C-alpha cells in the first residue's frame, strides 16, 4: 500500500513491499470480502437494454466455489492451464477466482481472436480446459480436432456439441471450497504477448503480480480507494490492462466493477454509460478516449461523476491531455508497462506528477531507467531503452516453455522493454518508439510474424511482410 504522503520523493523513500509468505489471488479478491462484508457489491452488470444486475461478494464467492468444484470434478489440478474466452460478465471473475483457488493457471484469451490465434495459444499453453460463451462455438469447432491437450470445454451460457453447460454443472456442485495454499511465486496466470520474431509468447505470472500492481493502482487512480469509487474500462478483461489495471485490483479493494459488453465499441454510448452508472474511475486506452472525444456532444459531460482516469498502451499525447483537463475537469494520468512488467511508470496529477507529452515518473516500489546497449544507465536527455530492475513483484516469472527468450529479455538485472525513451532532468520519462517491428494499434501490440503466417497459409500468397502504417486515431 502507498504511504499517505503528498510528496512524491518522500513517498518513494517511504515505500516498502510487504509480500506475505503465502498469497492467493482468489481469496484476496473475493473470500476475505465475502467473510467480512458479504452483501458488498462486487460486480454491476448492465445491458444496452437498460437492465442492471448487482452481484455481491457473497454471490461471487459461492459461484466461484461451484466453478472450482466443477473444474476439480473434471480433473483440473494444481498447475493445470485453464483458458478463458469470456466477455465482461459476472462469470469472468468467478472463473478467474475459481482457477486461482484451485492453484491452476488462468490463460485469458481475447474475444477478438480468430481460430488461428486461439489454436496456437490453446496448444502452446497445454490448456486442459476452456471456459467460453456459446457465440465462440463456431471458432472452436473449426479447430477442435487440432487441440492436442484440451479435454473439456465449458460454456457459461448454454451448451453445444462437445460443450458442457457450466452453469448446469456448477448447480450440482457445492458452494464451499477450500482454496489451495499458494505462494507468491506460484504460477497464477499466463497472458500472451506478441514480439517481433516468432509466435506469441506466454508471459507467466505468479500470484504476487496482483500485489505488484497495488501501488500503481493507488497512484494512477489518485489514492484509491475513496468513498463511492466505482471502476470501469472498455478494454477486454483478457488483456493485462483490463484484468490487472481494473478487474482484479478493484475487487481487491472491495470496490464494484462495471461489466458491460460492447460487441463493437460505441464511443457515444460510452458517455451515456458513464453518466447512467456513476462510474468514478476509468481506464480508457488512448484510441477509445480519442473516439469518445470525437463523439462528445454539447452536454456530454452532464451527469458524469468521474474522479480519475488512467490511460496507456500507446501515447496519450498533449492534445488529449489538455482536452480532458479543460472539458472533463479530470487530468488523464498516463501509465506505462508491458504484459511482462506492468504499471511501472505513470502520472499522478493529485500530487503534481503530471506533464502533458510525458508518461510520468517511476511508480513507488519500482526502479526504472533508460539504459544503453551495454546495460549502463543513460544520463538525462540521452536516448536508450526503457528498462525495469529485478527483483520486482510485478515482473513475470518467465516465458512459458521459452527459456532462451526469457534470458534475452534481460541485460543483467534489467528487463528490456524494447521501447525507446528518455528521462529529463526532472525525472519525467517520455516514450518515442520501438526498437523492433511490433505494431501498436489501438493499444494492442501485434507481432508481424503471426499475421504473416496467416497470410502465407493462403494458397495464393507465396511471401508476405507486415509493417505498421501510421494512423492518427489508432497509432498504427
Which sequence ranges carry the predicted segments?
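Conserved structural elements of the adenylate-forming
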Residues: 61-66, 171, 203-224, 244, ...
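Conserved ATP/PPi-binding loop(s) of AMP-dependent carboxylate-activating enzymes
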Residues: 362-365, 376-408, 446
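AMP-binding/adenylate-forming catalytic core of the ANL superfamily
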Residues: 113, 119-120, 130-133, 282, ...
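Conserved AMP-binding A3 loop
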Residues: 53-58, 188-215
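Conserved AMP-binding/adenylation subdomain of ANL enzymes
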Residues: 211-233, 237-280, 295
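Gly/Ser/Thr-rich phosphate-binding loop
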Residues: 252, 279-284, 293-354, 367
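Conserved pre-ATP/AMP-binding loop-to-beta segment of ANL
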Residues: 38-41, 155, 160-161, 171-192, ...
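Structural core segment of the AMP-binding/adenylate-forming
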Residues: 73-74, 97, 101-169, 182
